[in-house]
């Protein structure tokens, strides 16, 4: 999937990532082989970025990490694997310093799952996500607006964006298939990205 790498082009075009969001000491939760840290030259104010994956512990609890540890928290396509994304989200905020930023990417349920759940493209997905809907076809759907508004910390929303610039809406018809995982292609994105700031109170 390489969601972090695919999102780099958008981050380059927005100076806030290099000057505000990805600054200081951070952690990339669920980084796998595609950590944001590999693009260190694009984020010159980033001092360090720890990669966190399954061998490091439960990403939902982040139990070994103290409160208010990191200047930024980055995560690409990890929240959908959590048993309880609300608990995970609050713990990710817990380890973020006040004034720090969380940059998170999650799959959009319509573009990625394409109307079927449990996921046929990634069976470990436990939830689907949408920016906001009155009603979803997925019984496990989470509205991002609801997740953010129910956080146990004070936050400021800096950005919410559907990353669909390289998603080809007519591709299934073109290749004559009913469904296809476009993240298998080198450029295909079908994600939601949100950036939030943890406030002091």
Give the label of every model feature segment.
Residues 70, 84-87:
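Residue-level recognition of oxygen-bearing side chains
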Residues 72-78:
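A short beta-strand submotif of the Rossmann-like class I SAM-dependent methyltransferase core
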Residues 43-46, 66-68, 90-95, 120-123:
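Glycine-rich, phosphate-binding/catalytic loops in enzymes
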Residues 37, 83, 112:
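Glycine/Thr-rich phosphate-binding loops of Rossmann-like dinucleotide-binding domains
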Residues 1-68, 72, 161-175, 186-201:
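Conserved N-terminal segment of class I S-adenosyl-L-methionine
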Residues 21, 86-93, 101-201:
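S-adenosyl-L-methionine-dependent methyltransferase catalytic module, highlighting the catalytic core
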Residues 59-62, 77, 133:
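Generic anion/oxyanion-binding catalytic loop in active/binding sites
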Residues 82-83, 96-97:
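Helix-to-beta-strand junctions that scaffold the AdoMet/dcAdoMet cofactor pocket
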């Amino acid at each position: 999937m390489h969601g972090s790498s695919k999102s780099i082009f958008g981050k380059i075009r927005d100076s806030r990532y290099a000057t505000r969001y990805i600054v200081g000491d951070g952690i990339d939760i669920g980084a796998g082989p595609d950590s944001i840290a590999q693009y260190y030259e694009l984020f010159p104010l980033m001092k360090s970025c720890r990669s966190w994956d399954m061998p490091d512990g439960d990403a939902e609890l982040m139990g070994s990490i103290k409160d208010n540890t990191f200047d930024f928290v980055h995560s690409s396509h990890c929240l959908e694997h959590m048993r309880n994304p609300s608990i995970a989200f609050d713990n990710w905020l817990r380890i973020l310093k006040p004034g720090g930023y969380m940059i998170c990417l999650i799959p959009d349920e319509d573009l990625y799952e394409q109307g079927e759940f449990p996921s046929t493209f990634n069976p470990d997905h436990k939830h689907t996500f949408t920016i906001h809907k009155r009603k979803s076809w997925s019984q496990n759907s989470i509205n991002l607006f609801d997740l953010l508004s129910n956080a146990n910390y004070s936050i400021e929303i800096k950005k919410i964006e559907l990353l669909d610039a390289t998603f080809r809406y007519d591709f299934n018809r073109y290749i004559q298939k009913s469904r296809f995982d476009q993240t298998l292609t080198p450029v295909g994105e079908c994600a939601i990205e949100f950036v939030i700031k943890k406030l002091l109170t």
